[in-house]
From Swiss-Prot:
EC main group: oxidoreductase
GO molecular function: phosphoadenylyl-sulfate reductase (thioredoxin) activity
Catalytic activity line of the entry: [thioredoxin]-disulfide + sulfite + adenosine 3',5'-bisphosphate + 2 H(+) = [thioredoxin]-dithiol + 3'-phosphoadenylyl sulfate
Identification of the protein by name: Phosphoadenosine 5'-phosphosulfate reductase
Alphabetical GO biological process terms: hydrogen sulfide biosynthetic process; sulfate assimilation, phosphoadenylyl sulfate reduction by phosphoadenylyl-sulfate reductase (thioredoxin)
Organism annotation: Shigella dysenteriae serotype 1 (strain Sd197)
Pfam families: PAPS_reduct
PANTHER family (UniProt xref): PHOSPHOADENOSINE PHOSPHOSULFATE REDUCTASE
SUPFAM superfamilies for the chain: Adenine nucleotide alpha hydrolases-like
Amino acid sequence: MSKLDLNALNELPKVDRILALAETNAQLEKLDAEGRVAWALDNLPGEYVLSSSFGIQAAVSLHLVNQICPDIPVILTDTGYLFPETYRFIDELTDKLKLNLKVYRATESAAWQEARYGKLWEQGVEGIEKYNDINKVEPMNRALKELNAQTWFAGLRREQSGSRANLPVLAIQRGVFKVLPIIDWDNRTIYQYLQKHGLKYHPLWDEGYLSVGDTHTTRKWEPSMAEEETRFFGLKRECGLHEG
C-alpha cells in the first residue's frame, strides 16, 4: 500500500474518492486493529487526532490508539448535557490512560441555546439536527481545524447500527483521512479487550444502557429494541459527527 495524497483525493468527487481508496481498504481489512493504526501512522499525514464520546465501550479505542500513538489529542465535543456518570468516566479514563484531552463546546452555552431556540431535541428530526450541528458538528470542525488534523481516528463499529454497517476502515470526511481501526469488531471482541487490559465499560452499562449520549436523548435498552432506538427517540442514530 502506497502513501496517499490527501489534497489530490479531496479534489475528487466522493464516488471517485471511494474508488481510489478501495484497494487500500481491501488490504486494511486483512490487518488487525493495531496494524491498522500502525499503518495509518506510517502512511497518512499528521497531525493525528482521536475522537471519543466516552460512551459505553470508549475505553477500547482510547487505550488501543493511545498505546500506539501516545499523547495523541483526544477530541471530546461536550454538549453540557452529558450524564454525570459520563463526566466522571471522562475524568477516570483521562487519568488512567494519561489522555491528552481536548474539550470543544458550542459557542453558545446550553442555557443560551434553550432561551433562543427552546428545547431543540423536542422539535423532531429538524430540531435534533440543528441541535447536533450547534453542539457536535461545529465544535468538531473547529477542533479539526485548530489541531491541524489530517488524520482522524474514531471507534465506530459496523455492528452498532445499520448506518455503520458498510463503513470502510479508511475514508475521507471533513477534508481529512478518517480511520476506523475496530470497525469490524463484535461485542465479544470488545469484552475480551476490556478484560485483557483491565478496562471498564461506561458505568451506565450495568444499568441497562447500550449507548450513551445526552441525558435528554438517551434511553435504556428494553427487550425488542434495536440499539439505535435507544438514541434520539429512534428518529436517527448519528449525532452528525460521523455523517457526510
